[in-house]
């Protein structure tokens, strides 16, 4: 069967579950976009800029398992670099497709627009090499091998890939000789690794599991819970990877964030003689500036492409195989451990005093429903939200490793489009919102219905807590935030609110509950120096780390 290369590429993406494609049109991808919009199984979601498109693709992939975006050559693909780098850091598979000049133009080294004017056409692909797990230059001859290869790599590594697609190649017909198939996973024998772990557990008095974001990336929640249920080893999770473990499990202890953790959890983890680090990375923000008290060299590192125990290191083993091996261990822990204490309902007073961060998050705890997706911006929102108690079927999205402010607004666009039937709660601050605010326009056009909470506390609170509490560079221009939906054409679609007190907030939450078929935009005013308790401590840790 004859198909254009662009059609074949979209067939492959559809086969792995992609039904939305994000991006921005440009002259080197326009005829390729014709092939996208002509399909019934794919929807083109045009974004206001490529950065927002990359963030939206990331949010979509965190629910769907993979995403695709399209940019034009040079100016478009470089605008997406920040978002793609974040997806690489946090292991989110995004297929970044760049529509490029024709092969004839490239081979002749012509000084084409959107180039650097040097006659080279591999500069941007080289820039992507460090932030994608693999790259491909598509031709009619290699399309049926290269396209499946890079999609398979994205899914196996849970990281972005880059596809360079000259526009004449996208329009060229090829004879499709085989159906699309993902490359098979080559399983490794991990029996030696498991024997080492078993010996450590058998000699341990106080074992513990620290888990994190790779469990979310690889979708290994059931496998991890099976291992924990069989062995009775307690689990602490990092903020980097919130939702990796079922917080309703009797073996869940809570969030471990170094010196900031509850004393019982902190003492148990720090004094453990057998720490299994499963799918987690002990970053500065996740551990309050590396404030853990255990010896990092004694930790058993069980990560994708990284098994480390004592002097043994293996970088050619998958997290999937390692967790499958753990589930074959015949071990049961009999040591008692601190149990997670879920917060009490309605643990706050309603009054007409200015709303505080503490009360805001307590009220948010009561507001969360079983199936909600909670998206927390890297700022006051994240550092308050990662202590929220999740239900088993909640989904939590943050970006604490890459930490690019503004990420969550377009990411919410992506996550809501990935599953329109789940309520999305976005918690974001004013400074972050100003970076990517145009995503509201796309949300309105796509007629999605997230609930957006904007903390208006007049500036960059995280930065204030690190340095320059009253410095003018941490100030931002005050906007009338509740008018933004009207500016972006959503006056009739979006319910807007202005909140100053807990009494007002409670009334708004009840109105939101009563209108699930509407998008809601809530501006929540708070004091400029108010912050979640843990953010105050993290700020001090970062200030110390920076010298």
Task: State what each model feature region is.
Residues 6-18, 24-27, 32-37, 340-421, ...:
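Active-site diphosphate/adenylate-binding microenvironment
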Residues 155-156, 202, 369, 390, ...:
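Short conserved AdoMet
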Residues 61, 154, 228, 269, ...:
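N-terminal cationic-hydrophobic initiation segments that often serve targeting/anchoring roles
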